[in-house]
């Protein structure tokens, strides 16, 4: 009889162990899944944009959106996620977490709606507030078809109190001789935000003299924001008031930390605009540290007289600085490529140290910039690279508990599957999609 009871007991335990997770925590899973949106098709992406613009995501700070496949938007007219009303206000916007999971949205043509009254801010997202966007690549173009004042950012036109990480922009921008103002960048206007581990690959060209435009590889206009561990490899041809390889205009205590630009600088005009290898214009209380510019400087269309006062290897111009020491922009451990008549910054000659391109490709330069606090990886085929980054990815909690003999891949390892360490109790297993598509697994003992 005793053996029978024991047998029944273990049979019950076995059955319970194989029940769906719902038998233990249906409410928890239901809550986690209810605010999560999965996007795998173009139609689902367009529906998500329409839902945000209709107010379905208003106030949903816990919303989680996961892009789980590459999408091709060829032939589609893009309407930004978050669009304006008739008074140019943006009443509906995204405030949750958007996980790109390393996927690419390709052939996105921003041209048709750029400059229209309905889009004072424009991009994949028009405006985000309190949001997190990560692991997203945008590939496409914008050939300006309408004049206007637009905060344009390929990922986000405006980002307030938000974080953008691990995103790549491969979008070309051409003004097509139209008169435009606003911003051009991966993130047009960053307010109280952090932009990190992002890269711009797209070439920007604005050949018309404009009155108010900030253009940067990563951020156009940075206000009380931090841009760190970012890179620009796109070329910039510009006649805009503020153009920088990383940030167009840096002001209100904003910082650029550990970034580099290797894209070509092609300044246009008579020298009445600010153009810098890292930042176009720097303001009071701002800081640039551990950065380098190693791109070509093409002066063939630049007619300013020497010495150049608004063209610099680190920063082009200075704005809003009163002369008080606390207002003075700070520069630390920065380097720029040697070009005749181009200083680090005319007003702050010690903003950076001049080097040859050949030297910047050596291990000696890598040691110099890292010993002084820069965080880079040595690159035997060129200039130093940014440290490796694992961007956030959406976590998928399965509907089953597994026992301690479940075979999975350990987090951060790509070798053969191995068994979870033995132990008493059940384990909840969650999978995370990596940049390469490998599923890494987190394990948590319940």
Could you describe each region identified by the protein language model?
Residues 9, 223, 435-437:
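Generic short amphipathic/hydrophobic targeting helices enriched at N-termini
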Residues 5-13, 426, 430-433:
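Sec-dependent signal peptide hydrophobic core
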């Amino acid at each position: 009889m005793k053996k029978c009871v024991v047998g029944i007991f273990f049979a019950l335990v076995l059955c319970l162990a194989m029940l769906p997770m719902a038998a233990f925590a249906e409410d928890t899973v239901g809550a986690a899944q209810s605010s999560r949106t999965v996007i795998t098709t173009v139609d689902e992406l367009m529906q998500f944009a329409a839902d945000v613009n209709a107010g379905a995501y208003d106030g949903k700070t816990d919303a989680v959106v996961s892009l789980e496949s590459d999408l091709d938007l060829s032939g589609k007219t893009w309407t930004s996620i978050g669009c304006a009303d008739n008074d140019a206000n943006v009443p509906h916007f995204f405030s949750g977490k958007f996980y790109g999971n390393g996927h690419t949205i390709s052939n996105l043509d921003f041209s048709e709606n750029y400059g229209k009254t309905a889009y004072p801010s424009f991009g994949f997202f028009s405006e985000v507030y309190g949001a997190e966007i990560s692991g997203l690549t945008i590939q496409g173009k914008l050939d300006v078809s309408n004049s206007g004042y637009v905060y344009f950012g390929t990922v986000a036109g405006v980002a307030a109190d938000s974080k953008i990480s691990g995103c790549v922009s491969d979008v070309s921008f051409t003004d097509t001789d139209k008169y435009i103002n606003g911003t051009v960048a991966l993130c047009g206007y960053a307010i109280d935000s952090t932009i990190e581990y992002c890269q711009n690959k797209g070439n920007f060209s604005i050949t018309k003299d404009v009155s108010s435009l900030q253009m940067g590889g990563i951020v156009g206009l940075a206000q009380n924001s931090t841009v760190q561990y970012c890179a620009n490899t796109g070329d910039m041809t510009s006649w805009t008031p503020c153009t920088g390889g990383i940030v167009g205009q840096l002001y209100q205590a904003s910082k650029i930390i550990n970034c580099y630009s290797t894209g070509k600088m092609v300044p246009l005009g008579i020298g009445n605009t600010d153009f810098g290898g890292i930042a176009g214009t720097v303001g009071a209380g701002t800081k640039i540290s551990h950065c380098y510019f190693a791109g070509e400087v093409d002066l063939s269309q630049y007619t300013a007289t020497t010495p150049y006062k608004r063209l610099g290897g680190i920063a082009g111009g200075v704005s809003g600085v009163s002369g008080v020491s606390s207002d003075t922009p700070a520069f630390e451990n920065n380097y720029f490529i040697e070009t005749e008549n181009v200083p680090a910054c005319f007003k702050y000659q010690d903003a950076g140290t001049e080097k040859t391109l050949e030297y910047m490709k050596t291990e000696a330069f890598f040691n110099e910039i890292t010993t002084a606090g820069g965080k880079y990886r040595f690159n035997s085929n060129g200039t130093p690279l940014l440290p490796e980054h694992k961007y956030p990815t959406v976590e998928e909690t399965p509907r089953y508990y597994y026992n301690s003999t479940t075979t999975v891949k350990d987090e951060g390892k790509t070798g053969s599957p191995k068994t979870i360490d033995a132990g008493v109790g059940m384990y909840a297993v969650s999978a995370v999609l990596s940049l390469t598509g490998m599923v890494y697994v987190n394990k948590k003992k319940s």
